[in-house]
Design a protein with these regions (language model features):
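Extended intrinsically disordered or low-complexity regions, especially N/C-terminal cytosolic tails and loops
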Residues: 1-194, 206-309
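Acidic/aromatic/glycine-rich contiguous surface patches that form carbohydrate-binding/processing clefts
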Residues: 202
Length: 309
């Protein structure tokens, strides 16, 4: 408590005793205190270097919202991963693609993915299917993959490796035309992969909402301009914030790629979190322009994208 107090954090809505219990039972110091980066500090006077209008209750609230956000995002990313895998396998079948050839060429080009398959053989739930379609020597080296069809690669690969296979096949089969489609744009999908990994590893996503150096893919920036009421300058500034850029990209790809049945349920959850739960204790953030402007920007994108959901 002394460390937070020395930095200007108050305990008006949650007492110090309650805060101590919170750290013992619900969360640790680092994962709670990290959100202080979203608050301004005094730059002069006796309180120089101390936070302005930062109560412990605000840190707790952001922590709770971040947790709920991560849970939802993991499911949305899984929906996108599923949709991409279905679309690629369907493409193979509809066009009678000899997928054995593409699997062989892919693994010859991406050596590290062969090593990942070896690791999955030893640790994952895919070991039976891996043993059926791949051959290993006595040292557990992958030596033959000629009997592996495309659908098996789609099934066993982790999301990041799958994206490499996905874009390899798209490039080989269709050329670069697909790059104009946001749901098949490599930069956009890798932003989603990064967000998925961060949520899956339980990282604090809302740790810092200040503008930084992230550069949005052109297709993302153009789509946001089409859907948002904000000026281009504001959009460009907000999209330099990594958590905002990744989430906005997720929203745009999700809308375009995921089936209507799945989308209807998930967007209902999304709106419940952003348009209701996040507003529940909004009064404690009314003096924080960074948090308010970030929320309103995201709210605008959600409403502009899912008007009919």
């Amino acid at each position: 408590m002394k460390s937070l107090e020395s930095r200007g954090v108050t305990f008006d809505k949650i007492s110090k005793e309650e805060a101590e219990k919170y750290f013992l039972v619900k969360n640790n110091y680092f994962r709670t205190a990290c959100y202080r980066k979203n608050f301004e500090k005094n730059k002069k006077g006796k309180n120089n270097g101390k936070y302005i209008d930062l109560d412990f209750s605000q840190l707790v609230e952001i922590s709770v919202l971040d947790m709920r956000y991560r849970y939802l995002i993991v499911h949305m990313c899984l929906d996108i991963e599923h949709a991409l895998k279905v679309s690629l396998v369907s493409y193979f079948e509809e066009n009678n693609v000899n997928t054995y050839t593409y699997v062989s060429r892919f693994l010859e080009e991406y050596e590290y993915i062969k090593a990942n398959i070896v690791r999955m053989r030893n640790k994952s739930y895919c070991n039976n299917i891996i043993d059926k379609y791949f051959i290993f020597n006595d040292e557990n080296d992958l030596i033959d993959w000629s009997n592996c069809p495309g659908w098996v690669m789609v099934e066993i690969l982790a999301f990041g490796d799958f994206l490499e296979f996905y874009f390899f096949c798209k490039q080989e089969l269709e050329g670069k035309a697909y790059l104009t489609d946001i749901s098949e744009n490599k930069s956009a999908l890798y932003l989603i992969k990064n967000l998925r990994n961060a949520c899956a590893h339980n990282n604090c996503i809302f740790e810092n909402l200040r503008p930084k150096q992230s550069k949005p893919p052109t297709i993302v920036r153009r789509r946001v301009i089409q859907r948002s009421k904000y000026s281009k300058d504001t959009i460009n500034k907000k999209l330099t914030v990594r958590p905002i850029l990744e989430f906005v990209t997720l929203i745009l790809v999700y809308d375009e790629l995921v089936s209507e049945i799945i989308k209807k349920h998930r967007i209902s959850e999304l709106k419940l979190l952003f348009l209701e739960r996040m507003k529940k204790n909004k009064e404690i953030f009314m003096k924080n322009s960074l948090i308010l402007s970030s929320y309103r920007f995201i709210e605008d994108i959600i409403i502009g994208t899912f008007k009919e959901e």
